[in-house]
Amino acid sequence: MPTVRGCSLPDELLYDVENNIWYRPNDDGTVTLGMTAVAAAMAGQLVAFTAKKAGRKVQEGKSCATVESGKWVGPAKIAFDAEVVEVNDALTATPKLANSDPYGQGWMVKVKPADWAAAKGRLTPGSAVAGPYEAKMAADAFAGCAA
């Protein structure tokens, strides 16, 4: 698993580095997504998570959820057109799951992509994500995830 400045980035996932979102394709044609460890560390302890409701269509570059910490409120932008099919109610109830387990219990939503083949081509595979994340962290002056 790639680690950049102490932040884990599992190589079986796909990444939208610019928006700090990871994507995991599922066998049923849906895609699970969430905040990266980088995003969780930058935001600090999350205090609120509000997702678009199941059945909502979300356009590329638009918010599929809003996350809030003590120092930041912002959108979780999706990298492709999709329909929200499931919301992680556990994350809504306990937002800090995104900090403690960003790639497991801290997932945000599951979506049905309009065109997964095209969308997948715009994402960075985990095996190639270390370089782009190092550059982004340097540009953002982010020292890294706490040990």
Predicted regions and their residues:
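Short, conserved beta-turn/loop elements at beta-strand boundaries and strand-helix junctions
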Residues: 25-28, 86-94
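Acidic, low-complexity mobile loops and tails
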Residues: 1-60, 105-115, 122-130, 134-147
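Conserved, structured core segments of small domains
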Residues: 98, 116-119
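Vicinal oxygen chelate
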Residues: 82, 96-99
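Short, well-structured beta-strand-loop connectors
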Residues: 52-67, 78, 83
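Short, Lys/Arg- and Gly-enriched loop/turn segments at beta-strand edges
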Residues: 68-77, 93-97
